[in-house]
Amino acid sequence: MLDVKLLRTQFQEVKEKLLQRGDDLANIDRFEQLDKERRRLIAQVEELKSKRNEVSQQIAVLKREKKDAESLIAEMREVGDRIKQMDEQIRQLEEELDSLLLSIPNVPHESVPVGQSEEDNVEVRRWGEPRSFSFEPKPHWDIADQLGLLDFERAAKVAGSRFVFYKGLGARLERALINFMLDIHLDEFGYQEVLPPYLVNRASMIGTGQLPKFAEDAFHLDNEDYFLIPTAEVPVTNLHRDEILTADDLPLYYAAYSACFRAEAGSAGRDTRGLIRQHQFNKVELVKFVKPEDSYDELEKLTHQAETILQRLGLPYRVVALCTGDLGFSAAKTYDIEVWLPSYGTYREISSCSNFEAFQARRANIRFRREPKAKPEYVHTLNGSGLAIGRTVAAILENYQQEDGSVVIPGALRPYMGNRDVIR
């Protein structure tokens, strides 16, 4: 959520920044209109209350002097009724303003490249060289089917499309990757592990920015008003909702494995085969709470930490800075890490690392004090995938496939796979 003071004092600058996103400006224009009306009404109410206080004193004097005060009393009843009506108008305006604030996206950081779509994203760096095959590389779903690692057909029978059964060494590979990623983030980068709830309440979804904008992409339990989490970002960020932390608490680093659930409402016809786009998938998520002045250094660290996983696995990737038109609703700046998938002949997103500045903290009321009696300030929050597990499985199967249909297990992963070096 944006700072109301920023909207009032730098309205045109904010509007221009949001225009760079390609955002519909109707909400911010409506906000300005309603905010002016609210402040006008508040000024009128204060004026009426001041008048009421003055006249009340006059009435008191008239009563002490045994003089007739009925006309003034009647006038003040009318003033009281007007104040009551205007207070109700103000309350309704404030409700609408609060709703509008929740629907206005974050302002892009000045370093974010300006553009309209993913075509305008800017490549920052590459690591590793895509492998040259002496045979036609197969897509990961064909490799997995031949090795008995994944079963999409039976998952469709049991649940529907965009679900999968991991079987045998496929299930072990998934579990190995979860443990491998967590061990690196905990032991080398100092994250604290949390295992979050998979169901969250509405306030949590609002806090991280999933609601109200992305309601159609969420799985909602109507009878309890719970939501299945689309990412561990939601419960872990809300871990400190409505709290005031101390300066000594920061930075806070959390690493969380969870299943993630997404309706993929806008993805009809896209990535219909394989592990790239599922309704349910596993992910290791990294979440940071930091002081505002540290957040952009922390974004660089976060991105490098996610990259480390791909480097240890020997998977070629690139890092791109998202342009303003491709930036997520809550993010001020985002780097996507894209892994090379031979069957696609291109790089595909495997991690998204974002700095939200105070946008989520303001929605979730997460603050800190620099000194014991100092005024609370909003923390900055960051998160990133460290990594998406299913897409990592896909990348390993495709990049390490052999002509005979087997798959070599990356060296760093072998201790987690019973010291196997190949899947046959």
UniProtKB/Swiss-Prot annotation:
Residues where ATP binds: 262-264, 349-352
Keyword annotations of the record: Aminoacyl-tRNA synthetase, ATP-binding, Cytoplasm, Ligase, Nucleotide-binding, Protein biosynthesis
Q: Which InterPro entries match?
A: aa-tRNA-synt_IIb, aa-tRNA-synth_II, aa-tRNA-synth_II/BPL/LPL, Ser-tRNA-ligase_type_1, Ser-tRNA-synth_1_N, SerRS_1_N_sf, SerRS_core, tRNA-bd_arm
Recorded E.C. number(s)?
A: 6.1.1.11
The question of whether Cytoplasm is a record keyword is answered with yes
Q: Where in the cell is it found?
A: Cytoplasm
A Pfam family of the record is Seryl_tRNA_N
Positions that bind L-serine: 231-233, 285, 385
Stated family: Belongs to the class-II aminoacyl-tRNA synthetase family. Type-1 seryl-tRNA synthetase subfamily.
**Record function comment:** Catalyzes the attachment of serine to tRNA(Ser). Is also able to aminoacylate tRNA(Sec) with serine, to form the misacylated tRNA L-seryl-tRNA(Sec), which will be further converted into selenocysteinyl-tRNA(Sec).
Q: What is this protein called?
A: Serine--tRNA ligase
- Give the species: Geobacillus thermodenitrificans (strain NG80-2)
